[in-house]
């Protein structure tokens, strides 16, 4: 891998880290959306939630995600690998299901149980170079997790009813 590609991959990781921080730590929608390419897709695959444009993603973050983040949400990176077009990151997500989570478990009432789930995100980037400077923006952010295992730990069936 050339030095230029290594630097590009490092910048992509920085953009992804900034997006994660903007959403889950700072809860700053505008900072998160500023890191997205146009067009962009954000999809939580098992839940079928997310958006297909900056406007949809902004609405999704403002209405479904930020007001519904668990108080004790933790996100710990397990592994990350990248090439010049995408980053694949494996994270352990922990939380107490203390409120409805329409972005993660649509239609499921709070169970007040603690859970951890391993999530894998595949994040693609679009790069633009102008006057010798390359900027990278997220063009696709897809996250998958063991939905059945998570629901089992929380004591709910696929239809949202209790086990």
Question: Model-flagged regions — what are they?
Answer:
Residues 1-163:
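C-terminal and inter-domain tail/linker signature
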